[in-house]
Design a protein with these regions (language model features):
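Membrane-embedded catalytic cores of phosphoryl/pyrophosphoryl-handling enzymes
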Residues: 14, 21-30, 34-113
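Transmembrane alpha-helices that form the ion-translocation and gating core
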Residues: 6-18
């Protein structure tokens, strides 16, 4: 649920902010790659937290997920397709939408009990 909502939020934000490189028609802010990577990483971390997984593996998954997001962000920065603020905006979008989705799902589950 968090990934499609993140995609929708990212597309909406791009149309509202409308930041472009000069001469390039692509919209830049927020970075969709980083938004989706952040959302996927956070969903993974949250899933491992509630799954019957050995507790000692949870920090490993969290570090790997964080490394994945940093790798995607660094690649976008090195390729000069995004500025740092685009990447931070993407991370914030993925984080906010995923946490919001998780809170909404938790509230719905608790209400149904």
């Amino acid at each position: 649920m968090a990934l499609p909502v993140t995609l929708a939020a990212e597309v909406l934000l791009k149309r509202v902010v409308h930041r472009q490189w000069e001469g390039d028609p692509d919209l830049l802010f927020p970075s969709g790659h980083v938004a989706m990577a952040t959302a996927a990483a956070l969903v993974t971390v949250l899933a491992v937290r509630v799954a019957p997984v050995a507790p000692r593996l949870r920090p490993v998954v969290a570090w790997l997920a964080g490394g994945y997001v940093c790798t995607i962000a660094l690649a976008r920065l090195v390729e000069t397709v995004h500025s740092l603020t685009d990447l931070l905006g993407g991370a914030a979008t993925g984080l906010a939408v995923t946490l919001g989705t998780a809170l909404a799902i938790t509230a719905l589950v608790r209400r149904g009990r």
